[in-house]
Curated annotation (Swiss-Prot):
It is found in: Cytoplasm. It comes from Buchnera aphidicola subsp. Baizongia pistaciae (strain Bp). One of the essential components for the initiation of protein synthesis. Stabilizes the binding of IF-2 and IF-3 on the 30S subunit to which N-formylmethionyl-tRNA(fMet) subsequently binds. Helps modulate mRNA selection, yielding the 30S pre-initiation complex (PIC). Upon addition of the 50S ribosomal subunit IF-1, IF-2 and IF-3 are released leaving the mature 70S translation initiation complex. GO terms for molecular function: ribosome binding; rRNA binding; translation initiation factor activity. The gene is infA. This is Translation initiation factor IF-1.
Length: 72
């Protein structure tokens, strides 16, 4: 899947799940399950409840996503 095919959205982490999975509420009030991208995992970026994040969603499954950026 190329980067052009992905949908980028903003959201807030509302819950931490096992295995570095997170429940994120998007700006449009939908709730999705997301995991950390490989570069964030490699650089030990910590994500906590309440952090604002940028997600990539695929058009095939809009209930799962990948966290690609954490805002302050």
């Amino acid at each position: 899947m190329t980067k052009e095919d992905c949908i980028e959205m903003q959201g807030v982490v509302i819950d931490t799940l096992p295995n570095t999975m997170f429940r994120v509420q998007l700006d449009n009030k939908h709730i999705v399950t997301a995991h950390i991208s490989g570069k964030m995992r490699k650089n030990y970026i910590r994500i906590l409840t309440g952090d604002k994040v940028t997600l990539e969603l695929t058009p095939y499954d809009l209930s799962k996503g990948r966290i690609i950026f954490r805002s302050r």
